[in-house]
Amino acid sequence: MKVHFFTGFPGFISSQLIRSLFRNKQTQQVIAIVLTGETIKAHHEKNKIVNEFPNCSIRIVEGDITLPNLGVDNQVIEEIIPQIEVLWHLAAIYDLAVPRDIAWKVNVHGTTMVNEFVRSLPNLKRYMYFSTAYVAGTREGLLRESELIRPFGFKNYYEETKYEAELRVEDLKSEIPLTIIRPGIVRGHSETGETIKFDGPYFFLNLVERLKCLPIIPYIGQSTSTINVVPVDYILNASTFLASEQEAEGKTLHLTDPNPHPVQEVYRTMVKLVTNAYPKGRLPFAWAKLSLQIPFIRRKLGVEQETLDYLTWNATFDTTEAQKILQKGGITCPDFIQTMPKMIDFYLAHKEDTSYQIQIK
């Protein structure tokens, strides 16, 4: 059976992907590269997974994706290179507020090092690279899966460095069997609400939760945009299916919601579910943007200022290719509004646990 190699472990998506692969019997053996500072956490997560799947194994290998041979001991490298048939590259800095130098080192240089490692694998059947739908930067309108066009600008360094990284993976398509995954904004499980950190759409839950003591909670600006949020179970089901689906080889696929909801509808539903009242009035977008430039206010509200840029971004992700392939497996994206109650229940149950909250600077 194929050996799968992971970067990004013990992150939430990597850990859940491994569970999905074991559950689907797509592999019984995983090798995961882990930073030295993450080994205790990684072994803890490994033990949890192996207890769930006692016939499967996870080998933890210490390393660093920003180094040649991923910083792995030479003897270990020689041992594992012939074994790897599927490589999943998920390691990245996902913070919208990340400084450019840190994002470049991990997202761009790290991916370059992973690409070099991929080239050395004689038995590779598939390279599964996790990009983001937001490599589009400030481009608007219909964004196609087949396009990788440099935009006039980016909303943050996360977007810029993921774009640069995807360029480097795209260059491998002529020589390596690979699939590029472009997820939308990922939230917790659609059926349980489970996640391990409150970022992305959870910033707005932080805002609503911390303003609910006010007589009213206003809308933020006047937006006609949609927001593309997908549950982690859709990402897991789709990605594990695509990893063994021949038609996905050589493709770039949007794992985004083909039927996204308007920003105003999403915000209205969040406010109603948290406060049992609908938002009233309207805070001008410029005022909100200006307020979040003040660190104290950002921290008090639990919102990164870069988040606001997505409220007025008018773009639609084309999902034609992804849906065509995924329909073979009967895989569809759960509706955000219909499954939002589970997301909010989980948030409310864990909102006081600081391990879930992102440190706002």
Region annotations inferred by a language model:
Residues 2-27:
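N-terminal Rossmann NAD(P)H-binding glycine-rich loop of SDR-like oxidoreductase domains
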Residues 12, 318-361:
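Amphipathic terminal alpha-helices
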Residues 27, 189-202, 242-253:
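Glycine/proline-rich active-site loop of Rossmann-fold NAD(P)-dependent oxidoreductases
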Residues 58-109, 119:
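NAD(P)H-binding glycine-rich loop region in Rossmannoid oxidoreductase-like domains
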Residues 89, 97-105, 109-157, 179:
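Conserved Rossmann-fold NAD(P)-dependent oxidoreductase catalytic core, especially the SDR/UDP-sugar
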Residues 153-184:
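Active-site Tyr-X1-5-Lys
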Residues 192, 203-230, 234, 238-242:
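A conserved pocket-lining segment of Rossmann-fold NAD(P)-dependent short-chain dehydrogenase/reductase
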Residues 241-304, 324, 347, 351, ...:
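Mid/C-terminal beta-alpha module of Rossmann-like enzyme folds, strongest
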